[in-house]
Amino acid sequence: MAMQKAKEIVNSESVVVFSKTYCPYCVRVKELLQQLGAKFKAVELDTESDGSQIQSGLAEWTGQRTVPNVFIGGNHIGGCDATSNLHKDGKLVPLLTEAGAIAGKTATTSA
């Protein structure tokens, strides 16, 4: 049931960060996404009544029990290191743009 709820959340938004309010790695990922101008949904598992069940469902689904647990365009990205590495490699913004999370950053041709 919790895995199904996690999947529904992931499928309802272009970018989802499963997080905990006190986690410094979660804060880092959310700040990075904000700096890039990305729209995202943060699900704070420590404030959700069924947060621990959702976290268990995520672990069963993705093999990752830790937070942050990042999804872009319905695809599991991973945690803080994976997200930061994508950004360092220049791959995060294109993923966010493709998912529709960054408005006005689509490829345009000048006339």
UniProtKB/Swiss-Prot annotation:
Disulfide bonds join 23-26. Coiled coil: none annotated. It is found in: Cytoplasm. It holds the Pfam family Glutaredoxin. Its main location: cytoplasm. Has a glutathione-disulfide oxidoreductase activity in the presence of NADPH and glutathione reductase. Reduces low molecular weight disulfides and proteins. This is Glutaredoxin-C2.
